[in-house]
Every structure is written in structure tokens, then in C-alpha cells.
């Protein structure tokens, strides 16, 4: 039987560049090499594409360990140095000429999870894992996601959306608006970033200007959101027209909230699979995850995160990730492992869904 050739796309022009490499390394290790041939395709911070020895060398790095011992800035320097020392030159990757059958997108954040790469692949007629252009673009924007979820009957946290340029030009009216609209603590978030990059939990009005300034440095669209009490619950969803939801998992942050440092550097958060909730509430969370998935028109995969209050039974959407992490601490593969789908089988299913006809999958 001939092998299916996969282009494993990782790196990218995103603040989540290093996390993408760690995810791709895990995915590469889980792919069934009896059935699939893997072609690593690395995208640099500047957007140059490499495939060959340099891409394979970067993919082999234990970047997770390196990040825990060093800073993200140092890992970025290391990656740039490896490319500079490589004899290879960047190129415009021709998927068809390379005999690629399907692309596994392991890019996180901007220029990978937001519909841009998906549109490029659609134009070339190359199948790929995960959501299509529209679902990817909507899910990347937290404000648009909230609108779609609310329209589908899923609760979201009260929030206001701000324009970064307008705020920086005249900040005081925004401070007054936030103070009159919300109590403290509250969250300030870039609208279109993942891995909790640029997010601040603000406990006092005096800390609001700095939190807004940080968010504005990452995005032109900012979300100010009320803090919601409850457990942080994550649900993995898999499939196209008939998606299935995993057993829900629970994250207990090791810091004030589940931020980038807690996720990838200090690794102090505790996880519980299944989540410590009554069965009836677990079922309701799974149903809500499917509702959000369908409302956004997702396909292939997503991880849907909620805040669940066990006392009053409220389920509030936090966010949806259309290319969830695949690192060794990531919940998406862990949740399906606990639901009876091992990592290698999960990768196989994702590649299968990627190659379904677009009209059948609703792309």
C-alpha cells in the first residue's frame, strides 16, 4: 500500500512560534510511519519557508525543555541562528510538485490559525487539517466568537471591544467607560491571540492603563471582559458534519490565571480528567461545546473552553481554539486519550477528516 504524503507545517509569523514547534514535534512522533510519509515544512519568524535538513533539525529540538531553562527570546535567537547557519535557502513551497497529499497545520496564532494559510491551501486545492477559512477567522477573533456563541444560545462573559489606536490617542474616556461598566477584577485581552499572550488580569483601576497598553502592543482590537467565577473546563471536539465531544477536563491554574508562563514555562497548573463536576453538568458542557463548534462552522478539530459554576450550574464560554496545542502538556490529545482515542489514532482521524470532500465537510 502506498503511503500518504503529509506536509507538517509549523513555526510561523506568530508570538506562538515556539509552541507550534513543540506541537509539531509531538505530532510527528505520533504519526503512523507505516501509513504516512512526513515532509516537515518550517516557516521562520519572518515568513520564509524551509523544507529539508534545517526543518527536520528544528523539528527534532526538545524546545519545551529549552524554554523551561531559558527565555522565549533566547529560543528565538537559537532558531534564527540555526537558519543562518544552514546552507539551505528559503523557497516558495510547491505542494503539488512535492507530491503532498494533505497538510497537517500545526501553526498557532496569527498567520496560521486565523484563516490565512487555510485560504492559501484552498486556492491550491490542497486538503488540510482543521477548520476552513471562515471558521478559523471568526474563532481567532474573541469578540466575533462571542457574538456567534450568543446567537446560538451559549452564554459569554460581559465585555466591551476597543480600538487600540483610538484608545492610545485618548485613553481617559476609555478608563472612565471601563470603571463605570465593570467591577474588579477584570480581564484585558488582545482580541486575536492565543496561548494567553498579552492577557492581563486587572485587580485595581490603577493597573488598567498598563494592561491596556500591553494588549495594544499585540493587537489593534482589544477586549475588556468581566471576570467570571467558576472552574476552567476544556472540551476537545473532533469531526466534520457529525462532531463528537471528549470527556471534559478541568484546569486548576497555578497562578492568578492560566497564563503563558503557567502553561509552558513553569507548568504549575493542575489538570483533572474528567473534570470534577456532576455527570449532568459534564453532559451539558459537552453539548455546549458542540453547539459552539457548529455555530462557527468548525470542521476537523477545536478545543472549546468554558467557565462552569458548580453552585448555580452556569456555563460561560471562554474561547475556542481551532488549532489547539499538541504539546505533551496539551489538553486536546489528553482529553481524547481519556475518551478512548489514543494520540496516533487521533492524528489518523484528523488526516481522514481533512481529506473528506469539502461539500461533505461543510468547509
UniProtKB/Swiss-Prot annotation:
Record-level GO cellular component terms: cytosol
Reactions performed catalytically: 2 D-alanine + ATP = D-alanyl-D-alanine + ADP + phosphate + H(+)
Matches recorded under Pfam families: Dala_Dala_lig_C, Dala_Dala_lig_N
Cofactors: Mg(2+); Mn(2+)
Gene Ontology molecular functions: ATP binding; D-alanine-D-alanine ligase activity; metal ion binding
InterPro entries: ATP-grasp, ATP_grasp_subdomain_1, D-Ala_lig_Van_CS, D_ala_D_ala, Dala_Dala_lig_C, Dala_Dala_lig_N, PreATP-grasp_dom_sf
Biological processes, Gene Ontology terms: cell wall organization; peptidoglycan biosynthetic process; regulation of cell shape
Location (main, coarse): cytoplasm
Cofactor, free-text remark: Binds 2 magnesium or manganese ions per subunit.
EC annotation from Swiss-Prot or TrEMBL: 6.3.2.4
Pathway given in the UniProt record: Cell wall biogenesis; peptidoglycan biosynthesis
Cystine pairs: none
Positions in coiled-coil regions: none
Family assignment from sequence similarity: Belongs to the D-alanine--D-alanine ligase family.
Protein name: D-alanine--D-alanine ligase
Amino acid at each position: 500500500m502506498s503511503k500518504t504524503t503529509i506536509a507538517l507545517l509549523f513555526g510561523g509569523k506568530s508570538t506562538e512560534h515556539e509552541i507550534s514547534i513543540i506541537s509539531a514535534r509531538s505530532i510527528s512522533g505520533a504519526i503512523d510511519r507505516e501509513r504516512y510519509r512526513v515532509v516537515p515544512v518550517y516557516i521562520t519568524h519572518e515568513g520564509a519557508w524551509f523544507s529539508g535538513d534545517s526543518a527536520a533539525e528544528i523539528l527534532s529540538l526538545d524546545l519545551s525543555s529549552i524554554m523551561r531553562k531559558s527565555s522565549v527570546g533566547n529560543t528565538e535567537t537559537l532558531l534564527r541562528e540555526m537558519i543562518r547557519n544552514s546552507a539551505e535557502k528559503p523557497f516558495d513551497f510547491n505542494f503539488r510538485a512535492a507530491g503532498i497529499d494533505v497538510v497537517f497545520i500545526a501553526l498557532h496564532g496569527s498567520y496560521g490559525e486565523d484563516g490565512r494559510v487555510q485560504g492559501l491551501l484552498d486556492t491550491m486545492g490542497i486538503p488540510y487539517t482543521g477548520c476552513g477559512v471562515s471558521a478559523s477567522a471568526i474563532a481567532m477573533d474573541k469578540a466575533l466568537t462571542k457574538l456567534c456563541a450568543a446567537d446560538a444560545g451559549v452564554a459569554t462573559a460581559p465585555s466591551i471591544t476597543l480600538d487600540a489606536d483610538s484608545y492610545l490617542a485618548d485613553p481617559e474616556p476609555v478608563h472612565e467607560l471601563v470603571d463605570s461598566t465593570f467591577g474588579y477584577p477584570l480581564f484585558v485581552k488582545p482580541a486575536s491571540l492565543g496561548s494567553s499572550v498579552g492577557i492581563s488580569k486587572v485587580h485595581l483601576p490603577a493597573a488598567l492603563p498598563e494592561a491596556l497598553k500591553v494588549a495594544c502592543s499585540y493587537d489593534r482590537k482589544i477586549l475588556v471582559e468581566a471576570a467570571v467565577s467558576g472552574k476552567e473546563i476544556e472540551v476537545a471536539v473532533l469531526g466534520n458534519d457529525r462532531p463528537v465531544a471528549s470527556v471534559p477536563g478541568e484546569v486548576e491554574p497555578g497562578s492568578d490565571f492560566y497564563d503563558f508562563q503557567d502553561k509552558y514555562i513553569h507548568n504549575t497548573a493542575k489538570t483533572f480528567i474528567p473534570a470534577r463536576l456532576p455527570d449532568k453538568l459534564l453532559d451539558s458542557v459537552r453539548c455546549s461545546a458542540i453547539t459552539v463548534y457548529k455555530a462557527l462552522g468548525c470542521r476537523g478539530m477545536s478545543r472549546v473552553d468554558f467557565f462552569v459554576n458548580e453552585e448555580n450550574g452556569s456555563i460561560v464560554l471562554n474561547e475556542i481554539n481551532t488549532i489547539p496545542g499538541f504539546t505533551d502538556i496539551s489538553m486536546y490529545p489528553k482529553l481524547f486519550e481519556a475518551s478512548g482515542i489514543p494520540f496516533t489514532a487521533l492524528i489518523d482521524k484528523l488526516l481522514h477528516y481533512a481529506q473528506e470532500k469539502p461539500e461533505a465537510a461543510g468547509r
